[in-house]
Every structure is written in structure tokens, then in C-alpha cells.
Amino acid sequence: MEIILFDNKINSRFNKVTSTNYAAKLDQTSEIWLFNCIENTQHIFLKSQLKLSQITKIFISGTSFKYAAGLPGLLSSLTLSGKINTVSIYGPNSLKAYLQACTKYSQTNFSFSVNFHAVSYGKLVSGQSYTVICLPLSSNKLLYGFTILKKQQQGVFNLKKAITLNISQGPIYGELKGKHNFLSPDGYYLHGEDFSSSTTLGNKISIPVVLKYSRIISEMHWLSSYTVKSNTYPHQQATKYLLSNIETNVMNYQVSQDNNLIE
């Protein structure tokens, strides 16, 4: 899986911080999952090598307008591009009413179906390869974080080798794929590990959001396979613009210290 960070900078003109926006490009399929939808997201796609038509899921992490400011425009752009496949949107309950109002007053009809799913603590998406878990990041449940779990992939059975050794097709193929060993009637030793490729271990990817340090942030990053690159700012610069709503180098240090204690 490839995670692409869309630019998020301190806006010194308006004294605010834009929300964090990521696109996740899946390995085995051509799908793109979008985490938050800032303004002009469709223009960012046009400047990159990503394709709008490959977006299948959109995750919105908060009720604030900045997390979904570009969502109506993005959906309209998908319609103009001729998209017909269903798009699933995961977000707070108020987001559904917001989208319905946007389509009503702008008299916009989408060329594809939109499935809305209200986010809550627990498992949001469960597929063959990936699982997405939602965690509330505030006590009032107005802000959420997402963790992607990539499942362990079993090795591929080497059918060509089995045919070469004249092994008849049947339940023994499954046993060999399961790394079991056998001794054939003619005395030939069949080593299960030789008949399948290595198992690919799963991993954990936590999608960070712009937020002040908290214990739940540390738990999200605990045992993560790797940290998603995000823009961090010096503590003094951050507090100058927004006191408690930005990721700083101090916060990163606190998260790493917590993880060391847990381990």
C-alpha cells in the first residue's frame, strides 16, 4: 500500500491550519481510498499521477468543515469524468445531511451510487486484504482516527513443481501449501516449504490527523509497521498560530516515549 500525503501547511494569512489529507493506493487492486477531502482535492489529483475514477472509499475524520470542504466538488468531478461505480463514504452522521443539502440546492445529480456509513468505534471495513478500524479521538466523538490493518498473505502454491514431480491433484496440494511434510511410497521426501512462496506478514498503518497530543494517539501508533509521513512543525511556530490543534515535534517525541514504555 502506498500512502500519499496532500500538502497541509500553516496558513499565516488566515492564522489557521489546513486539515491533513491522505490518499491510500492499494497494492493488489487499482482502488484509491481517500482520508479527508480538503478544498481543491480534484485539482491535486489532476496534478498527480492518481486517477479520480479509482476512488472507491472516502473517510472523513471530523465534523469540522475543513475535513470535508472539497467533498461536493470532488463528487461532481467524478460525475463529469463518467464514473459509474459506487463510492462509499464514511463519516459523522451530520455529513450525510450536509451532502444532501449540497446536492439539493446545487441541483446536482451524481452518475454513481453513494453509500454513506456513519463512523463509530470499531471495525469499519473488512475485506480480503485490508481492515479499517475507527477510533474516537475526542470525548464528544466529533473527531476520529483511522488505522489500516493489512492481513497476512499466504504463500502461492507452486503448481508447476507439483506437476513435475507427478503429484496427483487432490487434498495433498492443500497440505503441502500448509507447509506439511510427506514421505511418498517410493521413499521421496516432500518438504512442504518447497512448494509455496514465503508468507507475507501483515502490518499496521495509522493515519495521523492534525491534533494535540493525547494517549489515544500513542495507542494508534503502537506497533505500527511504519509511520505515515506527515508535516510536523516546531513547537514555538505551532503555538504562535494555533495553540493545541497541530502536530509538533514535541508531540512526536511524546508518542515515541509512550510506545517505548508500552513495549
Curated annotation (Swiss-Prot):
Q: What is its main location?
A: plastid
Chloroplast as a keyword?
yes
Q: Where in the cell is it found?
A: Plastid, Chloroplast
Gene Ontology cellular component list: chloroplast
> What keywords are assigned to this protein?
Chloroplast, Plastid
Q: Fetch the SUPFAM superfamilies from UniProt.
A: Metallo-hydrolase/oxidoreductase (SSF56281)
Task: Identify a single GO molecular function assigned to this protein.
Answer: 3'-tRNA processing endoribonuclease activity
Q: Which branch of life, at top level? A: Eukaryota
Q: Which InterPro entries match?
A: RibonucZ/Hydroxyglut_hydro (IPR036866)
The family annotation for this protein states:
Belongs to the AtsA family.
Annotated protein name in UniProt: Uncharacterized protein ycf56
